[in-house]
């Protein structure tokens, strides 16, 4: 999963 908050997938 990729989120703009975490910036990781």
UniProtKB/Swiss-Prot annotation:
GO terms for cellular component: extracellular region. Its EC number is 3.2.1.15. GO terms for molecular function: polygalacturonase activity. Coiled coil: none annotated. It is an enzyme of class 3 (hydrolase). It catalyses: (1,4-alpha-D-galacturonosyl)n+m + H2O = (1,4-alpha-D-galacturonosyl)n + (1,4-alpha-D-galacturonosyl)m. Induction: Inhibited by citrus PGIP. GO terms for biological process: cell wall organization. Keywords: Cell wall biogenesis/degradation, Glycosidase, Hydrolase, Secreted. On the 2D-gel the determined pI of this protein is: 9.4, its MW is: 44.5 kDa. This is Endo-polygalacturonase.
